[in-house]
Swiss-Prot record:
HAMAP family per the UniProt record, alphabetical: PNPase
EC number: 2.7.7.8
Cofactor: Mg(2+)
Residue ranges that the Swiss-Prot or TrEMBL entry lists as coiled coil: none
One function term, GO molecular function aspect: 3'-5'-RNA exonuclease activity
SUPFAM superfamilies the record matches: Eukaryotic type KH-domain (KH-domain type I) (SSF54791), Nucleic acid-binding proteins (SSF50249), Ribonuclease PH domain 2-like (SSF55666), Ribosomal protein S5 domain 2-like (SSF54211)
InterPro entries per the UniProt record, alphabetical: ExoRNase_PH_dom1 (IPR001247), ExoRNase_PH_dom2 (IPR015847), ExoRNase_PH_dom2_sf (IPR036345), KH_dom (IPR004087), KH_dom_type_1 (IPR004088), KH_dom_type_1_sf (IPR036612), NA-bd_OB-fold (IPR012340), PNPase (IPR012162)
UniProt source species: Bartonella henselae (strain ATCC 49882 / DSM 28221 / CCUG 30454 / Houston 1) (Rochalimaea henselae)
Cellular location(s): Cytoplasm
Protein name (record): Polyribonucleotide nucleotidyltransferase
Length: 733
């Protein structure tokens, strides 16, 4: 019934298998990939023809994690998987980025790649396996995909690179790097690092590229026996149109690209484009040789050729800069004084307002992943409104690009954050891109670093980021620092590097062509380092380190620790006690399983009141210490005083005052506030208190130290006499 094909190899000490022909047979391509005991299903379907007037390649990649893969039922009311999580969105982008450049130019058929994690062993991360399975399914599908590609994860521990470390090994690694590529070229890199130098990062990229070669061989072997016939696809030949347009418009295109202002340049190019379309479009549709989309496509190609050749020939760029110069930078902090921290970072025509907010344990984000539930204390959100590029557009939930850019900035900042023990706040940074002409994600990194320091977050060191580009034609190439949006679109590489003066914390690279050598990447990294140091120096003009004090509008958090067996006492039955503390004091209280308690409030007195309350629950009263209490009951032999949380003690009638007392209520009544000293405990553990040796106005002791022992002995004797008298009277009755 099934005609299956299977390839199995040993990779990084674990078995990896690729199988096709049994599941999802109606898809154009389908592969079951297994690594260890993690299993993913990847499918590819591409439409047989493009939609009318389609002027772009509509590729969609959907990565989804099924809860049943780890034997769990989804939470929530519906009890089923719903909208993609942030992690699923990021992995969808991770798969998309290396495969998109490998589709044939001009291919515009609707194409969808769906990857599902159907089993997870909690040891082998499914993201790399999903990338491999997607590449294999595309290679088998017959669509014009110039692959295969493969991916690998690289860790770095004790001076050694690790290929595909287990999930639990990553906690010890100073590097989390994902690399994807073909046999001869690196296409994509994504990483977070602990301030590693450029040579270590480059070595990791090359180590990973070498490590993924066996996967490429396995996919090719599978394709030799299972691939479908290639689809008939012949790219449009628009060479005649290109020649004619070049003769007509080359001079005007070059002139437009001498305009350094983005908006003015775009206006000139739009006017030129309209003029060209009008010249090539006859009055009647029957006489049309080319469509508007074809004319627009060739116009864009001509722009790329002219800009690229001009950069290679003159070493000058669109805005007049040389290859390594960074645009002018202006940094400001504290621009929103009532927020906890804020910064405005402007680099050329790219600008970000970043605002930092400090919260408590209640503000931590609960993240439900296949590996389990965990709490995130650092949140970074990136917003890219349409007005930032002078356009109109929708507003709403963040798109994939916004999520991806935010995560890149998160990776850049995260290694420099203080530990939760030394800075027990939940931190949220929001980057509002107000202008954009290239490298807005790196502006977010710079702005976030400044805003956090303005908020008093003690970063280990400031962090800056820079986006690099590449123009390559044959053996000639130019590496560009701090690229513009046009240089990103028309170039061959988008290479973002973020870090401190000591090393790299995040790196993201997308390469659109083959032939990027190790030497070119080395030059790009060194040039990026110079740019990063320059940006850090410019940022230092605004702020060099975290402010010594938090904003007056920030919450204060104090940490205390209690014994684990006392947690239930603080929480109380059904949370009764903790709710009462919160309601009465106004403080926010977070209790962790190890007995760590975080108390938060903008008011120091509120925090102190909550601390005293908790201490009164978990601490034991100390003999010889004076406490303030409340009379809760009176009797003929004395008064009961609540003096330590829920703890009550007896002040014997002889200890109410230095004068002789015949009736307790002559001295105190229920509800009175009194000062008492803890004298000790009787043989039954009952508390013995005294009022007469404490000044009731000041709460200070009024009997000298030499008399304390005698007073305690007298107290014990009188208490025994009173107790014996009470028992005799009760017996007589």
């Amino acid at each position: 019934m099934f005609k299956t094909h299977k390839i199995e190899i040993e990779w990084a000490g674990r078995p990896l298998t690729l199988e096709t022909g049994k599941i999802a047979r109606q898809a154009d391509g389908a592969v079951i990939a297994t690594y260890g005991e993690t299993i993913v299903l990847a499918t590819v379907v591409s439409a047989k023809s493009p939609k009318p007037d389609q002027d772009f390649f509509p590729l969609t990649v959907n990565y989804q994690e099924k809860s049943y893969a780890v034997g769990r039922i989804p939470g929530g009311y519906l009890k089923r998987e719903s909208r993609p999580s942030e992690n699923e969105t990021l992995i969808s982008r991770l798969i998309d980025r290396p495969i998109r450049p490998l589709f044939a130019d001009g291919y515009k058929n609707d194409t969808q790649v769906i990857v599902s994690v159907i089993q997870h062993d909690l040891e082998n991360n499914p993201d790399i396996l999903a990338m491999i399975a997607s590449s294999a399914a595309l290679t088998l599908s017959g669509v014009p995909f110039m692959g295969p590609i493969a991916g690998a994860r690289v860790g770095y521990c004790n001076g050694q690179y690790i290929l595909n470390p287990h999930i639990d090994e990553m906690s010890e690694s100073k590097l989390d790097l994902v690399v994807a590529g073909t046999e001869n070229a690196v296409l994509m890199v994504e990483s977070e690092a602990q301030e590693l130098p450029e040579d270590i990062m480059l070595g990791a990229v090359m180590f990973g590229h070498k490590g993924l070669q066996p996967i490429l061989d396995a996919i090719i072997k599978l394709a030799e026996v299972a691939a479908k016939d290639p689809r008939d696809f012949v790219p449009e030949d628009l060479s005649d149109l290109e020649t004619a347009m070049l003769e007509m418009a080359e001079k005007d295109i070059r002139k437009a690209y001498t305009i350094t202002d983005k908006q003015e340049r775009y206006a000139a190019l739009d006017a030129l484009k309209t003029e060209i379309i009008n010249k090539f479009m006859p009055e009647t549709e029957e006489d049309c040789k080319f469509s508007v989309d074809q004319i627009a496509t060739v116009f864009k190609q001509l722009q790329a050729k002219i800009v690229r050749s001009n950069i290679l020939d003159t070493k000058k760029r669109i805005d007049g800069r040389d290859l390594s110069t960074v645009r002018p930078i202006q940094s400001e902090v504290g621009i929103l004084p009532r927020t906890h921290g804020s910064a405005l970072f402007t680099r050329g025509e790219t600008q970000a307002i970043v605002v930092a907010t400090l919260g408590t344990g209640e503000d931590e984000q609960y993240i439900d992943s296949l590996t389990g539930m965990y709490k995130e204390t650092f949140l970074l959100h990136y917003n890219f409104p349409p007005f930032s590029v002078g356009e109109t557009g929708r507003l709403g939930s963040p798109g994939r690009r916004e999520i991806g850019h935010g995560k890149l900035a998160w990776r850049a900042i995260h290694p420099m954050l203080p530990s939760k023990e030394s800075f027990p706040y939940t931190i949220r940074a929001v980057s509002e891109i107000t202008e954009s002409n290239g490298s807005s994600s790196m502006a977010t990194v710079c702005g976030t670093s400044l805003a956090l320091m303005d908020a008093g977050v003690p970063l280990a060191r400031p962090v800056a980021g820079i986006a690099m580009g590449l123009i390559k034609e044959g053996e000639r190439f130019a590496v560009l620092s701090d690229i513009l949006g046009d240089e990103d679109h028309l170039g061959d590489m988008d290479f973002k590097v973020a870090g401190t003066a000591n090393g790299i914390t995040a790196l993201q690279m997308d390469i659109k062509i083959d032939g990027i050598t190790e030497e070119i990447m080395k030059i790009a990294l060194e040039q990026a380092k110079g740019g990063r140091i320059h940006i850090l120096n410019e940022m230092a003009k605004a702020l060099t380190s975290a402010r010594a004090e938090l904003s007056e509008f920030s919450p204060r958090i104090e940490v205390m620790n209690i014994a684990v067996d006392k947690i239930r006492d603080v929480i109380g039955t059904g949370g009764k006690v903790i709710r009462e503390i919160v309601e009465q004091t106004g403080a926010k209280i977070n209790i962790e399983d190890d007995g760590t308690i975080r108390i938060a409030s903008a008011d120091a007195k509120t925090i102190e009141a909550a601390k005293r309350w908790i201490h009164s629950i978990v601490d034991e009263p100390e003999v010889g210490v004076i406490y303030q209490g409340t009379v809760v009951k009176t009797a003929e032999f004395g008064a009961f005083v609540n003096f330590f949380g829920s703890r009550d003690g007896l002040v014997h009638i002889s200890q109410l005052t230095t004068e002789r007392v015949t009736k307790t209520t002559d001295v105190v009544k229920e509800g009175d506030k009194v000062w008492v000293k803890l004298m000790g405990f009787d043989e039954r553990g009952k508390v013995r208190l005294s009022m007469k040796i404490v000044d009731q106005k000041t709460g200070k002791e009024i009997i000298g130290e030499d008399s304390i022992k005698a007073e305690q002995e007298k107290y014990t004797e009188e208490t025994h006499k009173s107790e014996n008298k009470r028992r005799r009277k009760k017996k007589e009755e």
